[in-house]
């Protein structure tokens, strides 16, 4: 339940840890010194694309699609229900990650839209941010436009753009 997830996140914080999930597929990091596949996701080839998905099921498909297109992945994080770690936390990590050159987000909802907008505006000046959001809500469209996020209408479209940006 959400209440139990929050209690777990609170306990993790008290112990000095962060919590991914619940409902997360896990995370992948392909840096040669760290190569990590924590969860059920296979380890993709190393690359410059950072990917986040809230959906674990979709996450597996996203990694398979990246492999099919020949796109290497710097890191992949399946956020799950986001009791603690959010897309905003990932954006801050990827901003500092020298290997990440392109960021792709599959967002189902925003925890803190203002913070997202502020971070995306800053980070997007250095690294392009692509996003897929299942809603056709004009407010989401406006948020992405204001933040400088490139909105894709589908994962296929997002990966086509990511492929071009990763090569450039």
Protein language model regions, located:
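Catalytic-core regions of core metabolic enzymes
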Residues: 1-168
């Amino acid at each position: 339940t959400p209440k139990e997830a929050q209690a777990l996140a609170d306990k993790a914080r008290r112990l000095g840890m962060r919590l991914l999930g619940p409902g997360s597929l896990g995370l992948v990091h392909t840096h040669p010194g760290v190569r990590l596949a924590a969860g059920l996701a296979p380890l993709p080839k190393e690359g410059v694309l950072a990917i986040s998905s809230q959906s674990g099921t979709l996450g597996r498909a996203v990694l398979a699609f990246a492999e099919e297109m020949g796109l290497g992945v710097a890191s992949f994080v399946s956020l799950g229900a986001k009791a603690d770690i959010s897309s905003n936390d990932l954006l801050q990590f990827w901003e500092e990650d020298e290997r990440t050159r392109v960021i792709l987000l599959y967002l189902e909802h925003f925890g803190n839209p203002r913070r997202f907008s502020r971070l995306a505006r800053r980070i997007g000046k250095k690294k392009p941010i692509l996003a897929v959001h299942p809603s056709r809500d004009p407010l989401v469209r406006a948020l992405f436009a204001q933040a400088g996020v490139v909105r894709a209408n589908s994962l296929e479209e997002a990966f086509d753009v990511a492929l071009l940006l990763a090569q450039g």
